[in-house]
Structures are given as structure tokens and as C-alpha cells.
């Protein structure tokens, strides 16, 4: 109940009208009150809504795959707005500027496309993200390699729009179908992960008590983020609560920092853990389960129903924001409660 009280309080504080947008990458393309993607899209020429949707997919997919935790020492100075941002917001704006520059495109005449990913280099990412010894970014090589594998696997992310649109029935597309397409098409990009019968399992881990635990945090974060460009293209996305909560360190950190979850061994707070360690897998799986538990409690406090306030709004308003706030109150730099070794593709 205490955690639900805290989340409801943060939602009312940030969104007094309770008009909370979906938890999506698009929230991170804002700076100094400006919607940078909207500005970019308004200036461009689109022959039809599908063309704009493909470009939005190009931006969103690449940006989400670059969105794993930056580490506490990185920041991004955006020249056009003069804003300096860190973590997800910084990564979001940096990735938008990288996309805008045409670095992902095969032709300078059409910069707002991502069809040159297979040849993307870490040095390009380092320059665009202002990485230096004084401004280090966690997992730089891993991020660039992930984009290259994305390009090798699917060519252009924008083409996923057409795949998803083709799965709509009478203009209606269930949100789990978005995730299904992503898991099918992006499977090959996840390296050094569990493989069963030749199939890469992605963000799936073995746990001694739970067996195989599928989490797919980045893929689900991407699925949530693709809802809006699909809607803008005229599709009706339904069953949004068919996606799960996100097992990342803001939501998971909320439950540790608020005392909902307690470490069996207090010394684990000072140790560094691998992503596949049973402690981390258990923490992430409990995070998904607890998000399902806390959502109705938050709605009850806000006096709203699930149909108007789906989990995507609870996350945004919400558990993610409260987790970040608690982290900032408890730790210098606002990092997660557990120290986790990241290659830039999970957290």
C-alpha cells in the first residue's frame, strides 16, 4: 500500500488532470518544452501517413536499442536547444540528433531513414553521443554492434510498420501482435544469450527455481513505443494491457527502495551482479509480477478504471518516475539499488 500511495502521489503531482501519456520513447524526445520529433516531422515531406510511420519506426527502434542505462557519468549537450540531459532523456535526444544527421541513411537526400545500419561504427556513435574519458558511456561497443546486427537482420526498421499493419484486422491491431513481430524479427540481434534448438531466446534467463524466465524488457519497451506511430497512421491498437510491465531498474528499484522487496543477504547490496545471476533474474521477474499487483491499487487511489488508465499509463506516470525519484533520494547519481554489469543491451 505504501508504494501505491507514493506512485499515486507522483502521478497527481505530475499530471493533475490524470491525462498521462503512454510509457514510450517519445516522451524522451522533448527538451525545453519542445517536442523535437514533432518539429522534425513537420519540416519533412511525407507522401503519405505510411511514409511518416516508417520514419518514426526507424527513429524509435534505433533509439530504444540505444536506450540501455548510460551509467552515472554520461551527459549530452544538445546544441539546438541548449539543454544538457542525462540517462534516458539524454540518450533519447542524442539518438534523435544522430538519426536527424542522416548517419543511418544510405542517401543524403533522404536522411530520415535507417537503412545503413549494417555498416554503423562505434566511432560514429561515440562522436554523436559526445563520449570521452570525461564523459563515458556504458556499453558503447555493445550498442553499436546491436545496431549493426539490427541492420543485418531486417535491413530497415521502418519496414516493420508494413509487417504490423498487415496483421491488423479491420484496422485493429492487438498490442501483443506488435511484440510478436518484434520477437520474431529481432531475435537474431541478441548475441551471447541463451539459444534453444537454434533459436536465440533474447532477454530470457535460467533461474534455479523458476526455470526459463522470459522478460524481453527492451522488446516490450519498443512495443509500447510503437503504439503511437501506428495510431498516427490510422490503426486502432487494442489490448494494450496484453503487454507486461517492464523489468528494468526504475520499476524494480521502486520495490527495493520502498521496502516491498528485501534482500535475503544484505551484503548483496554492495556486490556487483551479472544480468543472468539468479538474484537479478528473480528481482526482474518479481518486478513484472508486482507491477500487475500495484497497478489496480494505484487506479483505486486515483479513482480511474483500467480501460482509461492501462498499465502503460501507470508505468509512465507512475512507477518509473517514482522509482527514479526514490533512487535520487537514496543514492548519489540516482543509480539502481543493485550494482549490475551491463553490456548496454539489457539495462
Where are these regions (language model features)?
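Extended, well-ordered protein cores
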Residues: 1-235, 239-267, 271, 278-347
Amino acid at each position: 500500500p505504501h508504494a501505491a500511495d507514493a506512485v499515486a502521489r507522483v502521478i497527481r503531482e505530475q499530471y493533475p488532470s490524470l491525462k498521462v501519456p503512454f510509457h514510450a520513447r517519445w516522451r524522451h524526445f522533448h527538451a525545453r518544452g519542445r517536442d523535437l520529433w514533432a518539429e522534425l516531422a513537420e519540416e519533412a515531406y511525407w507522401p503519405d501517413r505510411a511514409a511518416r510511420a516508417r520514419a518514426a519506426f526507424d527513429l524509435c527502434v534505433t533509439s530504444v536499442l540505444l536506450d540501455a542505462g548510460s551509467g552515472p557519468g554520461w551527459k549530452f549537450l544538445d546544441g539546438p536547444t541548449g539543454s544538457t540531459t542525462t540517462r534516458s532523456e539524454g540518450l533519447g535526444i542524442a539518438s534523435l540528433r544522430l538519426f536527424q544527421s542522416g548517419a543511418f541513411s544510405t542517401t543524403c537526400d533522404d536522411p530520415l531513414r535507417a537503412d545503413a545500419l549494417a555498416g554503423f561504427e562505434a566511432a560514429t556513435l561515440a562522436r554523436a553521443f559526445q563520449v570521452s574519458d570525461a564523459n563515458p558511456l556504458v556499453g558503447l561497443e555493445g550498442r553499436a554492434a546491436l545496431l549493426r546486427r539490427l541492420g543485418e537482420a531486417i535491413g530497415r526498421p521502418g519496414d516493420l510498420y508494413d509487417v504490423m499493419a498487415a496483421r491488423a484486422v479491420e484496422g485493429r491491431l492487438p498490442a501483443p501482435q506488435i511484440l510478436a513481430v518484434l520477437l520474431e524479427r529481432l531475435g537474431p540481434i541478441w548475441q551471447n544469450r541463451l539459444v534453444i534448438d537454434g533459436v536465440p531466446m533474447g532477454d530470457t534467463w535460467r533461474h534455479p527455481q523458476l526455470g526459463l524466465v522470459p522478460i524481453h524488457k527492451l522488446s516490450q519497451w519498443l512495443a509500447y513505443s510503437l503504439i503511437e506511430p501506428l495510431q498516427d497512421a490510422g490503426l486502432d491498437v487494442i489490448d494494450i494491457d496484453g503487454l507486461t510491465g517492464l523489468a528494468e531498474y526504475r520499476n524494480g528499484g521502486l520495490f527495493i527502495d520502498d521496502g516491498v522487496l528485501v534482500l535475503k543477504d544484505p551484503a548483496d547490496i554492495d556486490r556487483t551482479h551479472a544480468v543472468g545471476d539468479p538474484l537479478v533474474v528473480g528481482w526482474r521477474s518479481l518486478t513484472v509480477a508486482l507491477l500487475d499487483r500495484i497497478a489496480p491499487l494505484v487506479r483505486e487511489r486515483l479513482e480511474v478504471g483500467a480501460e482509461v488508465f492501462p498499465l502503460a499509463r501507470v508505468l509512465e506516470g507512475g512507477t518509473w518516475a517514482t522509482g527514479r525519484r526514490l533512487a535520487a533520494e537514496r543514492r548519489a547519481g540516482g543509480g539502481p539499488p543493485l550494482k549490475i554489469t551491463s553490456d548496454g543491451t539489457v539495462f
